[in-house]
Amino acid sequence: MEKYDLAIIGAGPIGLFAASFANLHGLKTISFDALDEIGGQINMLYPQKNIKDIPAFPSIKGKKLVSQLLEQNINTKFILSHKVKEISFLENENILVDKKYEVKSLLIATGLGAFKPKTLPLSTTLDVNQHIHYSMQHPEIFANKKVAILGGGDSALDWALELANTSDVFLIHRRNEFRGLESSVNKLKSLKNVELLTPYLPKDLQLNNNRMELVLHKVGASQDFVTKNVDEILVAYGFKSDNRQLRKWGIKLDHNLIAVSQKMHTNLPHVYAIGDAITYPGRVPMIALGFGEAQIAISNIMQDLFPEKTMTFHSTSI
């Protein structure tokens, strides 16, 4: 039986920072992630994305952010390709994780949980599927090509800005208004090699001479169609999340997210949660906010486990 002070489920940016902050306070920590690499959704889907809302970084790529967070985790043990399936409570109030790891506290930092991309709602062939993408791990494959990007959120806008450096881009959204940053929209509108097509939905997709013919239907206009010839398609429709495992453990959810107190405590003893997995009034899904939640959770875990200790809450304490 392996014993730890803290187990963290999720090795994305928020989980990584929580682990390093736990190390700072001397907690023996183990981290689990279902993916086969550290970094969570950012490393898996958006490693080249420029993140612009991290304090002190005007812009930092997702992969670089993960790398720097990992540098802080010299004492954390990581177990990858491991989806935690079972937790139970022992007589000594410790938590048994998957019948092998005994921990004093548990911190959930799983983001939206198991995620699958929302797929393009068109009938396609195997040949066509080779040109449809749901992430941009390797932007070089889009260079010097005509690329259609479907979606209206920050990911779609970020991808369009990135690919506009090397490609001709069609950004297609079902509404006239985009959900992402207005500054990104304005920048795209100023680029000659970017065309914004709104409000349009994909209607048909065919492969002809190794180039795709994408037929678009204008929303609200029964006979208004546009055809664009493209080499590659990037779909940014978001993800379907699955937190059924949390319900199985008895964790209280609110609209499929974990309900927490001001201390980031769940309804279960010694179980905390942070990041996009949680909800409370006024919360917004931002990485910087998740970092703060990690500090709140670890500080309260320390007080929970070691109430007799005088806490130094952060490295800048006098």
Swiss-Prot record:
Gene3D superfamilies: FAD/NAD(P)-binding domain. It is an enzyme of class 1 (oxidoreductase). FAD binds at residues 33, 41, 46, 84, 115, 276, 316. Pfam families: Pyr_redox_2. Keywords: FAD, Flavoprotein, NADP, Oxidoreductase. The keyword Oxidoreductase applies. One of its GO terms (molecular function) is ferredoxin-NADP+ reductase activity. It catalyses: 2 reduced [2Fe-2S]-[ferredoxin] + NADP(+) + H(+) = 2 oxidized [2Fe-2S]-[ferredoxin] + NADPH. Binds 1 FAD per subunit. Its EC number is 1.18.1.2. Its cofactor is FAD. InterPro entries: FAD/NAD-bd_sf, FAD/NAD-binding_dom, Fd--NADP_Rdtase_type_2, Ferredoxin-NADP_redctase_2. It comes from the Bacteria. Homodimer. Belongs to the ferredoxin--NADP reductase type 2 family. This is Ferredoxin--NADP reductase. It comes from Lactobacillus gasseri (strain ATCC 33323 / DSM 20243 / BCRC 14619 / CIP 102991 / JCM 1131 / KCTC 3163 / NCIMB 11718 / NCTC 13722 / AM63).
